[in-house]
Amino acid sequence: MDAMKYNDLRDFLTLLEQQGELKRITLPVDPHLEITEIADRTLRAGGPALLFENPKGYSMPVLCNLFGTPKRVAMGMGQEDVSTLREVGKLLAFLKEPEPPKGFRDLFDKLPQFKQVLNMPTKRLRGAPCQQKIVSGDDVDLNRIPIMTCWPEDAAPLITWGLTVTRGPHKERQNLGIYRQQLIGKNKLIMRWLSHRGGALDYQEWCAAHPGERFPVSVALGADPATILGAVTPVPDTLSEYAFAGLLRGTKTEVVKCISNDLEVPASAEIVLEGYIDPGEMAPEGPYGDHTGYYNEVDNFPVFTVTHITQREDAIYHSTYTGRPPDEPAVLGVALNEVFVPILQKQFPEIVDFYLPPEGCSYRLAVVTIKKQYAGHAKRVMMGVWSFLRQFMYTKFVIVCDDDVNARDWNDVIWAITTRMDPARDTVLVENTPIDYLDFASPVSGLGSKMGLDATNKWPGETQREWGRPIKKDPDVVAHIDAIWDELAIFNNGKSA
């Protein structure tokens, strides 16, 4: 897996600009609603990343729509295009369940993968670009950062692309997670992490081990693309996000110890927020427009107090918006879909394709095609999708079809559902399962049901009826009509519609 090399975000932006994938906006634009409107129109048109050089009221530029096309996601992962992301998935599948070499020849075949693993440890620096400027104490003022307000009814400006760094009291490895953070004061943010996410689990363990003590937290903004994407990729639990970023980049991830705590942050990050969460300090978060296309409920979450802001000279603020698909998370979902396929295929070799339609909010509906081998096979695959990767814990609907169906073509999928399913026999309902807290359709917050649809051809044991045979054209007739098609001139110019 030959990687394209980027040392930091600025390196990546230079390459994007050279390829016409970055547009600098010099006209003054307001971070309050206006940047979202421009970024949304640009993303829907498949346009470039946007660097707003003169956000109204601020001296710091805003970067938006960085991963607004699958191509730029692939480039951020060090690949030339989306098709090569399957190689990233194969590497992750190998790392999730590595197989020892079966012999001398197999050792040489696996050597490239083992070489990549050697790049995994981080490299700690004594000084780093992210600490070129430091403010602390009363000088900390988050209002100097052009934090966007994305939608008219949003409660306040919202940090969206922060990489939150935490470590549990009994863990050697840090956790990187992306959690939105509402601005509520010059040095205060609300940390919206759900109870099952890595950062929240680290916090819960800390509170149990150190009752009443402050929990150290750091947030990196504008890290290099490999590190950013490492935080949203299905990395095996035994592998750190920094290590995975090193694999993508082909070089060890450079980190630096924070000024005020022992956490390590990306050395090249544009901005780092350092601080703590005081157990018991909570605040109501929201409402905010989110990736479902709705405003979510207000709920209480911990307050993150920022004690230090470190940053690069001429720092860039990296941001995004979330709304009804397509948005940037939906585009990331389309690209990362290619990463998921080899991981699932390693566990379930019968899977031919796996697709998360972006209009299904990136993860709420999955279509799987399989080479069916026995009665009940589709139901086994449904259960596997829900349980194998935690990324699909919140997938509400799983549709399983045969391999003669194109998982990415709704015409095919709907045809299979309507012709191969009996609703009572082929629908699986599972109650009281984990559901996204943002899913207001569930009867209880965080707990709801799932539906599996078996749209495969039915085998003996699944039906007593004679099963229909799909209509197929005679290939000889098709070839003959192809040969005389132009002579027919049905469409005047002789070309088929």
UniProtKB/Swiss-Prot annotation:
It comes from the Bacteria. It catalyses: a 4-hydroxy-3-(all-trans-polyprenyl)benzoate + H(+) = a 2-(all-trans-polyprenyl)phenol + CO2. Transmembrane segments: none annotated. GO terms for molecular function: 3-octaprenyl-4-hydroxybenzoate carboxy-lyase activity; metal ion binding. It is an enzyme of class 4 (lyase). The active site is at 290 (proton donor). Mn(2+) binds at residues 175, 241. It is found in: Cell membrane. Its EC number is 4.1.1.98. GO terms for cellular component: cytosol; plasma membrane. It is a peripheral membrane protein. Pathway: Cofactor biosynthesis; ubiquinone biosynthesis. GO terms for biological process: ubiquinone biosynthetic process. Keywords: Cell membrane, Decarboxylase, Flavoprotein, FMN, Lyase, Manganese, Membrane, Metal-binding, Ubiquinone biosynthesis. Binds 1 prenylated FMN per subunit. Prenylated FMN binds at residues 178-180, 192-194, 197-198. Its cofactor is prenylated FMN; Mn(2+). Catalyzes the decarboxylation of 3-octaprenyl-4-hydroxy benzoate to 2-octaprenylphenol, an intermediate step in ubiquinone biosynthesis. Belongs to the UbiD family. Homohexamer. This is 3-octaprenyl-4-hydroxybenzoate carboxy-lyase. It comes from Shigella flexneri. The gene is ubiD.
